[in-house]
Amino acid sequence: MNFRTLLRFTVCGIFAAALLLSSRLDAQHLTLEGQTGGFLTPTAYVVYTDKGHVFSHPAVGYHFVNTSNVIGNVQTVSFVEGFANRAEVGYTRSIHTLGNSAAFSSLWNYNGMNIFSGKVVVLKEGTGGELVPGIAVGGIVRTGDHFVSGALNKELGLGSDTANTNEDLYIAATKTWLKRPLPLLLNFGWKATNASIFGLGGQSTRFGGRAFGGVGIPLPLGHGLAAVPSAGFTQEPPQVKNLGDILVGGKAHIPTTLDYAVRITQKQKPHFSFDLGIGQVAGNIGQTAVATGLPAPYPPVVLVPVDLKARKVLGMGLSYRY
């Protein structure tokens, strides 16, 4: 397996490394979009604030997702501030490079987008009993999202290239159980969103509800470190604005994102984490008709599969809290 293939695993595995570890998994573990959580999915934790303080030390994150074949590689840089272990706000800049497909990569020929996030803990983990999960509500706003929907707006002659704004509003419930016989980290949530594949897939045709979640198993490594093998999922909106206009049947097939990942971090009061994962995102999403330009008896059009070649992607992430 060469380096390019290896690095193609990301988008998701990443997502689910959405699982943390020790009793302080609420510290600096940031998602691709700059929230405390796994690689992609948010948890009910926020950036840790020292006792007696209102403001946390800032947490920073860097993530890389290799989807170079069609979509193009994605990098994000995040800065997040926590407040009294009750809330956090953050800013993430998504940096994008052009993919390698002459046929389809033009739909992602943009520098990236801005991502603003916020989260509030409404119920702290363990309130009223050790089995009670933490519950948080939060939101994301992505601005300057030209991907797919914006690009097709111009290519289809519907208007100018459009920079869309899309949002997520979510609730997440998270429980870390570190007792025998089996330590577990469980995270499940629901979001209302109008973004496809976290904005990378464009704007969905409507605002709708989607589920996400994951499970991890915290394992001690020695020297104060722990590993969290995990698996997770994120449901995607069924359709993308403008995309059906170029597909046979008028509909795309956007599958649920799956991920399998490992997170390495400190067991107590963690200041860093490293994520590495394999994800299954989107592959063949449909067919498009392409004119042959040939005279009869040759067919006037041929059907070409629209393959995003992102069913096996590699991602990595680094997070650090000062």
Task: State the predicted function of each range.
Residues 54-60, 75, 85-87, 114, ...:
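Outer-envelope beta-barrel architecture signal
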Residues 115-118, 122, 280, 291-322:
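Outer-membrane beta-barrel "beta-signal"
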Residues 83-85, 119-133, 174-179, 217-221, ...:
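Outer-membrane beta-barrel proteins
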Residues 158-250, 256-257:
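Detector for outer-membrane/organellar transmembrane beta-barrel domains
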